[in-house]
């Protein structure tokens, strides 16, 4: 009787420990599941929206997490069987297995707090902006190839870290920036870890710039929104200072304090680049651009070619009187690619001389405002 009672007490102790650890294992496993789902969401965001590739260590961790979760779930079933078996040895062995698996789950969970989950594909990354291919129109590139080529060469020069593109609105600065961004993403061996595109606009908002950069480098933190501007800057700096990046800033109206935003200054060591567009040459000076490139209006022949391409030869030749008026309409676009493309497309279906004369009259008396469109 005494021996049986002692055996019963021992069994109860082992079963109690086993059940306690089984509960802890279940809680830890659920937490690991949640963490794994969060990491996978971040990975998919980077892969699908920013054309990035998940880090090898993240892929390994996801695989390990999935395996240990399945094993833990099997242990839940085994612990139930062991509890009802009545065997001390069985309960004791199961309790030790569960305890070991609990430590394994906790260890894997502790390694899952990734700041960055993905990198550029083939050495180039980021999105879209940055890392994100920006929609471009082939028709708008006529006459801008030389400027795009110059910016591209600057990206390979060691003594040029900050490049400023300036010129009047509608002259094609954003088109050039888009071409360079997309070319950088398409060519896989240029050595940039992140290619980041940020639209700045007239109303400068430093935290908005920080939030855009944070999304494009794949850093997602639930506490991000509660962080101060300085804390966000420190986290961005921590990540970008270890990587080579190309940062494209479109539509800059005033000096952007990039250091305050957390962006490390480009230098010979990090070999990073910053390229921005602005209407003001003064902003180029304020941004400490080592290279300033003025984007000029198109010469007449280039302007006329671009206009004709968007109108279509069929329309221009549809009536003998249209060609001359069409040239006058194109001249009113003042060599601005945006105006030439927009008005050219609008006139593509106009095949009577009167429609063209009406358009010329409107342009002569109230030139269109292209503010807010591609500049």
From Swiss-Prot:
Q: Does the keyword Nucleotide-binding apply?
A: yes
Q: Name one GO molecular function term.
A: ATP binding
GO annotation terms (biological process):
defense response
Q: Name one Pfam family in it.
A: NB-ARC
Domain NB-ARC residue range list: 158-372
Q: Which residues form a coiled coil?
A: none
Q: Which UniProt keywords apply?
A: ATP-binding, Nucleotide-binding, Plant defense
The keyword Nucleotide-binding belongs to this UniProt entry's keyword annotation = yes
Q: Where does ATP bind?
A: 167-174
Purpose: Possible disease resistance protein.
Task: Kindly provide the name given to this protein in its UniProt entry.
Answer: Probable disease resistance protein At1g52660
State the species of origin: Arabidopsis thaliana
* Lineage of the species this protein comes from: Eukaryota, Viridiplantae, Streptophyta, Embryophyta, Tracheophyta
């Amino acid at each position: 009787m005494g021996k049986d009672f002692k055996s019963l007490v021992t069994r109860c102790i082992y079963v109690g420990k086993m059940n306690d650890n089984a509960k802890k294992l279940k809680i830890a496993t659920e937490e690991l599941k949640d963490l794994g789902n969060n990491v996978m969401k971040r990975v998919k965001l980077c892969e699908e929206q920013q054309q990035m590739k998940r880090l090898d260590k993240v892929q390994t961790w996801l695989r390990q997490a999935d395996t240990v979760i399945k094993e833990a779930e099997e242990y839940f079933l085994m612990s139930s069987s062991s509890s009802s078996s009545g065997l001390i040895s069985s309960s004791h062995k199961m309790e030790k297995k569960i305890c070991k698996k609990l430590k394994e789950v906790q260890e894997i969970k502790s390694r899952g707090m990734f700041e960055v989950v993905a990198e550029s594909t083939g050495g180039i990354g980021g999105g879209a902006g940055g890392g994100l291919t920006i929609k471009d129109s082939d028709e708008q590139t006529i006459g801008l190839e030389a400027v795009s080529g110059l910016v591209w060469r600057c990206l390979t020069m060691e003594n040029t870290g900050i490049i400023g593109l300036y010129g009047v609105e509608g002259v094609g600065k954003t088109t050039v920036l888009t071409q360079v961004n997309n070319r950088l993403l398409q060519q896989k061996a240029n050595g940039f870890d992140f290619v980041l595109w940020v639209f700045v606009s007239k109303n400068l908002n430093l935290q908005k710039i920080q939030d855009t950069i944070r999304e494009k480098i794949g850093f997602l933190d639930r506490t991000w929104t509660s962080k101060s501007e300085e804390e966000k800057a420190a986290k961005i700096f921590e990540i970008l200072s270890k990587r080579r990046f190309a940062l494209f800033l479109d539509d800059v109206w005033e000096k952007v304090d990039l250091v305050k935003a957390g962006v490390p200054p480009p230098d010979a060591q990090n070999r990073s680049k910053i390229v921005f567009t602005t209407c003001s040459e003064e902003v180029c000076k304020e941004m400490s651009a080592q290279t300033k490139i003025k984007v000029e209006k198109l010469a007449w022949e280039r302007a006329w070619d671009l206009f004709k391409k968007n109108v279509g030869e069929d329309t221009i030749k549809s009536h003998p009187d249209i060609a001359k008026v069409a040239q006058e309409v194109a001249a009113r676009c003042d060599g601005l690619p945006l105006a030439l493309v927009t008005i050219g497309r609008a006139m593509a279906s106009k095949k009577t001389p009167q429609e063209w004369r009406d358009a010329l009259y409107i342009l002569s008396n109230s030139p269109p405002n292209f503010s807010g469109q591609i500049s």
